[in-house]
A protein has these predicted regions:
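Alpha-helix N-cap recognition
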Residues: 94-96
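A cross-kingdom feature strongest in bacterial/archaeal respiratory oxidoreductases
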Residues: 1-72, 79-81, 86-89, 98-235
Length: 235
């Protein structure tokens, strides 16, 4: 994960890192936000290590490395194991990622544990009160197809595809009219104290009052919440 691109509030993440007394980063890639890091521990991406992922639907998927880690990189679980052992902590005596998985699932079948403990079924209904301001614009912060993680962001072939477009501030044609804007006009998009310049784009598939501004991009990483109040004015 790259905090300045992957966090829900990228600007807040940047500030927290900059103000922290000590920053230790386990990462496969060096990014701008990590200039504040006191220690960088190189870990291998998933292609260079074995491990297990659990998808959003609760599906457990294990895999093996396709190649050896580059240079001094090590699998993340090994780095954590060494740190745990060095600090004299218990629960870090593992020799393989398979042992880590077994410890998590307690020797049971992952599917059984997921079904009983980690599924998304509602156990009870909770009533919540939501206050929505109808007189302000709301940001819809989507993640572009090839900006979803550090690997695809650094893939030259993927970044040259037609799917990769310059970020825009998309909104319904009625909203464009109300704001006195034209399709294709440059606008100032502001969240909190941060603002960026983007091109306005008509998209009648969006609800009125919603402005779609992509996230996980350097140009929009200075903005605030992915889903929150937003201001749009002529540049």
């Amino acid at each position: 994960m790259e905090p300045e691109l992957d966090c829900h509030h990228a600007a807040q993440a940047r500030q927290a890192i900059a103000e922290a007394e000590c920053v230790i980063a386990l990462t496969a890639y060096k990014s701008e936000a990590l200039e504040h890091a006191d220690v960088l521990l190189p870990i291998a991406p998933f292609t260079e290590t074995s491990g297990t992922y659990m998808s959003m639907e609760g599906r457990v998927q294990s895999f093996t490395a396709v190649t050896k880690p580059l240079g001094e990189c090590r699998p993340g679980w090994k780095v954590l194991r060494v740190l745990g052992n060095t600090l004299g902590l218990s629960g870090f005596d593992f020799d393989s990622s398979e042992q880590v998985k077994n410890a998590i699932f307690g020797g049971q079948k992952p599917s059984t544990v997921v079904w009983n403990s980690l599924n998304n079924n509602l156990r009870e209904l909770i009533e919540i009160q939501v206050k929505i301001k109808s007189n302000v614009l709301q940001r819809l912060g989507e993640v572009p197809q090839f900006q979803s993680d550090a690997i695809v962001r650094r893939s030259p072939p993927l970044q040259k595809t037609r799917a990769v477009q310059a970020p825009v501030a998309a909104m319904h044609s009625q909203l464009l009219t109300e704001l006195g804007l034209d399709d294709g006009e440059m606008v100032t998009v502001k969240q909190g104290v941060a603002s960026v310049l983007l091109k306005a784009k008509r998209d009648d598939g969006l609800p009125h009052g919603v402005v779609r501004v992509p996230t996980a991009l350097p140009v929009t990483s200075l903005l605030g919440d992915l889903m929150g109040e937003i201001e749009v004015t002529r540049a």
